Amino acid sequence: MTELKNDRYLRALLRQPVDVTPVWMMRQAGRYLPEYKATRAQAGDFMSLCKNAELACEVTLQPLRRYPLDAAILFSDILTIPDAMGLGLYFEAGEGPRFTAPVTCKADVEKLPIPDPEGELGYVMNAVRTIRRELKGEVPLIGFSGSPWTLATYMVEGGSSKAFTVIKKMMYADPQALHLLLDKLAKSVTLYLNAQIKAGAQSVMIFDTWGGVLTGRDYQQFSLYYMHKIVDGLLRENDGRRVPVTLFTKGGGQWLEAMAETGCDALGLDWTTDIADARRRVGHKVALQGNMDPSMLYAPPARIEDEVATILAGFGQGEGHVFNLGHGIHQDVPPEHAGAFVEAVHRLSAQYHN
């Protein structure tokens, strides 16, 4: 087993005792940091940054040099799998991700390959191995993937969407085609995350960014069912240590009980969910991650500290809380405000761990 100097993040996910509440931030390696912008400029474009193991490692480590974070998260993108399937990922200035060859029908789905994690996606595994080497056991490394439903939204819509009419048309008019796509994606994500674990990821997270746009019944059928399949297929031990799994559905606060039934170790909460209520509902089964509104980081540090105190009090005494934002950090947040946030979590949380 590789020694970890700080394992409180992994311990909290497994609801084991910790000295203070661990904290990390979604998108902690990102555009709010001037050093990230410099490295990205050096890489040329976003996917070139993802595909260069040394540069992906550099941006993964940048926030850890600034802040005493309790975990590193692989610098990558959720759309690596659709890109490896041959959909032609590119980024439009101000528009976000787009695909040159979106999925439009069942025949398109049938043609899609299941990517080899050490082949087309080998650059991700190289980044994982490089980051693990450079972390030198300081903190654990989180691997991740998008959920099948969330990946499918981009693949069918051809990019980002506000109304999701194209994928919902497929869902209601040709559900068989969508299920075929989701099944293929579930197999791909399982292989991809297991390869990340074998390469050195010590915890994995599934981001279901768009599950919250579904009705309750559709969420169960088209999103949660496939995440459950992935959880069932994941390696749960590696290097002599349990590998915790976190599920995060943005807008999924009403479905926490169903999510906790998947066998995952933790649930991510967005900021619209009350953490005290979430703990009452599922805290006996899973750890909870979250859940400060990322926009709170625009506030003065004293106000950020008040919000941290409120969320810590909401979760209350005992184990099973990983502090985080309710979604990714915004790109124009002052870096010193992120620092105040991390410092406040550690300082104010000790009283909850006796």
Swiss-Prot record:
SS bond partners: none
EC number: 4.1.1.37
Pathway, per record: Porphyrin-containing compound metabolism; protoporphyrin-IX biosynthesis; coproporphyrinogen-III from 5-aminolevulinate: step 4/4
Gene Ontology cellular component list: cytosol
Taxonomic lineage from the root: Bacteria, Pseudomonadati, Pseudomonadota, Gammaproteobacteria, Enterobacterales
Full protein name: Uroporphyrinogen decarboxylase
Gene Ontology MF annotations: uroporphyrinogen decarboxylase activity
Alphabetized NCBIfam families for the sequence: hemE
Record's keyword annotation contains Cytoplasm: yes
Entry-linked Gene3D superfamilies: 3.20.20.210
Main localization category: cytoplasm
Subcellular location: Cytoplasm
Organism: Salmonella paratyphi B (strain ATCC BAA-1250 / SPB7)
GO BP terms, alphabetized: protoporphyrinogen IX biosynthetic process from glutamate
Known catalytic reactions: uroporphyrinogen III + 4 H(+) = coproporphyrinogen III + 4 CO2
Protein origin, superkingdom: Bacteria
Residue positions binding substrate: R27, Q28, A29, G30, R31, D77, Y154, T209, H327
PROSITE patterns recorded: UROD_1, UROD_2
Pfam families assigned to the protein according to its UniProt record, in alphabetical order: URO-D
